[in-house]
């Protein structure tokens, strides 16, 4: 397969905070006002190994754990929250974050706990002050959705010393924290296998942004399409997290690649923008995405080019975080093997299993750790 990256990256330093909000970022600049632009091209060659395109023994597109993984049982008496106070750090007021943080908040408050909910608006530099404040006020637990925990080791250690659980989702895997997440790379494989089944051959456009979770999805997608001999053209702006940005990138990509059979959005908003571009161009390409946000379900329901997404199950992750921390406050150890992320299963969603309007994908999620 030929994998061509045709992306124009424009990265103002003052906006790099958004990139590091969900993981590490290696980009840097000494000028806070200038914009650095680079163009990157990557070529790969197809191999004879096609195992990546095969569905694993556990069908990960139907909420099963991957072959070789170890299931982790989540349990905890949530009535433990009575009279307790916690801090929740939320990346931004977007579905991908609030689908985790809001069920978590509800679980704690409905069981008598008090929540200090803080949204950093995409700015991870606000996290240290929040953690310091929560340490000083001696909260009973700390939660974080999507804000990179790099550099916070000393604060995490202080919480650990105080027996204060730190439970996170999509925020790295720092020592001392219980790290939950979706298997982002596997999400890419799931949507990749769907495309192989639907189009068989040809060219696919991926519109993506520079974020660790999105790059992991790209890696899984690339693996599957490469094995099937399908060409992947990658476009997008580093900070292009909006539907409008994705639409602009895909419109240009379709002009250069009018025979593309499919367009993939790195997450929900990018998929919605891609669908608008495909419609405007009069293209026959199908559009797919990953996340399982309400806007994706609405796009599938509309009956246009948007036909599938991978639902991560953030809601179940929030409920699991509530149970895990409650169990730890009660004096029990964290579940699973220490130091390894606890991953939630995902579900491929099409028109055939689309949730009702206003509802999330309801398949019970399993949690697991990789070898």
PLM feature spans:
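Extracytoplasmic "Venus flytrap"
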Residues: 57-108, 115-128, 145-149, 208-216, ...
């Amino acid at each position: 397969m030929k994998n061509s990256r045709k992306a124009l990256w424009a990265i103002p330093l003052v906006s790099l905070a958004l990139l590091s909000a969900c993981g590490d970022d290696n980009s840097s600049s000494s000028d806070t006002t200038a914009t650095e632009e680079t163009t990157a091209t990557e070529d790969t060659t197809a191999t004879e190994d096609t195992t990546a395109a095969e569905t694993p023994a556990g069908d990960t597109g139907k909420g099963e754990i991957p072959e070789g993984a170890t299931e982790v049982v989540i349990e905890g008496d949530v009535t433990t929250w009575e009279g307790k106070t916690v801090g929740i750090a939320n990346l931004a007021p977007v579905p991908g974050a609030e689908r985790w943080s809001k069920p978590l908040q509800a679980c704690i408050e409905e069981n008598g706990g008090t929540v200090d909910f803080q949204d950093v608006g995409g700015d991870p530099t606000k996290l240290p002050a929040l953690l310091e404040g929560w340490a000083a006020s001696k909260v009973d637990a700390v939660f974080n959705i999507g804000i990179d925990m790099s550099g916070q080791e000393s604060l995490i250690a202080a919480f650990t010393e105080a027996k204060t659980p730190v439970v996170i989702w999509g925020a790295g895997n720092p020592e001392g924290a219980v790290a939950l997440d979706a298997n982002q790379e596997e999400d890419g494989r799931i949507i990749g296998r769907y495309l192989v089944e639907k189009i068989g051959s040809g060219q696919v456009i991926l519109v993506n942004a520079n974020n660790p979770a999105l790059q992991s999805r790209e890696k899984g997608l690339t693996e599957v399409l490469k094995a099937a001999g399908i060409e992947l053209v990658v476009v997008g702006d580093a900070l292009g997290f909006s539907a409008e940005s994705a639409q602009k990138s895909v419109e240009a990509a379709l002009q250069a690649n009018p025979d593309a059979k499919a367009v993939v959005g790195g997450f929900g908003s990018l998929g919605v923008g891609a669908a608008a571009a495909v419609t405007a161009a009069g293209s026959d390409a199908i559009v797919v995405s990953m996340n399982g946000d309400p806007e994706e379900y609405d796009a599938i329901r509309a009956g246009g080019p948007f036909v599938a997404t991978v639902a991560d199950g953030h809601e179940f992750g929030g409920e699991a975080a509530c149970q895990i921390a409650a169990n730890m406050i009660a004096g029990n150890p964290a579940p699973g093997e220490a130091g390894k992320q606890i991953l939630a299963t995902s579900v491929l969603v099409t028109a055939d299993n689309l949730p009702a309007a206003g509802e999330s994908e309801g398949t019970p999620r399993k949690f697991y750790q990789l070898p």
